[in-house]
Structure formats: C-alpha cells, structure tokens
Design a protein with these regions (language model features):
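Regulatory, non-catalytic segments
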Residues: 124-133
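…primarily DNA-binding HTH/wHTH and HhH modules…
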Residues: 147-172
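Short Lys/Arg-enriched helix C-cap and helix-to-coil transition segments
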Residues: 137-144
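Basic nucleic-acid-binding alpha-helical/helix-turn surface characteristic of O6-alkylguanine DNA
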Residues: 1-121, 167, 171-172
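A generic hydrophobic-helix recognition signal that picks specific residues
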Residues: 17, 133-135
Length: 172
C-alpha cells in the first residue's frame, strides 16, 4: 500500500504521544483520520503542541508507533498509514508528496525534486519545504541530498540523517 497524503484540516480532536526510538525521543500527533506529525525532541520547526491532548490509546498513534518500531527493526520499508501533514502551504504539501515517492534505500536531490514538480529553478524553495516536513521518517526527507550527493541538513540533526540512511542501506 502506498502512503496516502490527505488534506490537512485542524480538528479539535488531535492527540499526541511521546515515544522512544533508537534515535531519541519523538512526539507523534494524529487525529481520527491519520498521522499529522512526527518530530524528534529538539528538532527544528516543531509547532507548539501544548494544546493537544495525550492519546496513548488513540488508533493512529498506536499504529504509527508500531510501524516505526518495525522500521527500526528492519522489518518495514514502507509505511501504511494515512498521512495528514500538520500545517504547511500548498507548495509545501506538493514537496512533501514528492518526498513520499522516494523509495527506501534511494536518494533524490533538491534539484531532482524541483524538476519533478516542474519548477527546475526552485531547488532552494524545495530545500526550505523539506526542512519543514512535519512527518520525519514517515515522509522521508532524510533521503534528500545535495545535487553533488553530499549529505545536507536535516531538521532532526545530521547524525540522525546518517543513522537513518545507514539503516536503509544507503550508506555504508
């Protein structure tokens, strides 16, 4: 099953759950329709989540935690969840949808994503949208590299990006 990106609609019934991963603490955010956010602790661009209720038994949070554990254990390469990115402009949503198309174990450059979106001069804007991806790992922004193949920034930290790419067999 491919990742489904649904339209964002902020609802009063949004829930959050902190989880532990091999790369540190994350917070997951979901509503009744799917996963909306996944941020590492101290990651750049985390919105305020203080207004959200804790949802330890909420279906999409539990399913997201389960699939993420399978990913880290090497038993999952693709997530099967409805993804509803928290916030973002129409352009950012297009970029985030493009991230969902980058296969496990592969890379794409900012310039390749810009060309894919029909905006070959927009690599810098692509980079800014990638940096604000609200669904770390689930929308694989860690698979985006510079045009020369160099590892560039990751809102969760470059060390985490390296670890994720190693987990996927992209780096030795």
């Amino acid at each position: 099953m491919t990742q489904a990106l649904a339209e964002l609609s902020r609802t009063p019934d949004q829930w959050q759950m902190p989880i532990k991963t091999p790369l540190g603490q994350m917070t997951l955010v979901a509503d009744e329709h799917g996963l909306q956010g996944a941020w590492f602790e101290h990651q750049a661009h985390i919105p305020s989540l203080s207004h959200l209720r804790w949802g330890p038994n909420m279906h999409w949070l539990c399913e997201s935690r389960k699939q993420l554990a399978e990913y880290f254990a090497g038993r999952r390469q693709q997530f099967e969840l409805p993804l509803r990115p928290y916030g973002g402009s129409e352009f950012q949503h297009k970029v985030w949808q493009a991230l969902a198309q980058i296969p496990f174990g592969r890379f794409a450059s900012y310039a390749e994503i810009a060309r894919h979106l029909g905006q070959p001069q927009a690599a810098r804007a692509i980079g800014m949208a990638v940096g604000r991806n609200p669904l770390s790992i689930f929308l694989p922004c860690h698979r985006v590299v510079g045009s020369n193949g160099a590892l560039t920034g990751y809102a969760g930290g470059l060390d985490r990006k390296v670890a994720l790419l190693q987990l996927e067999g992209s780096l030795l």
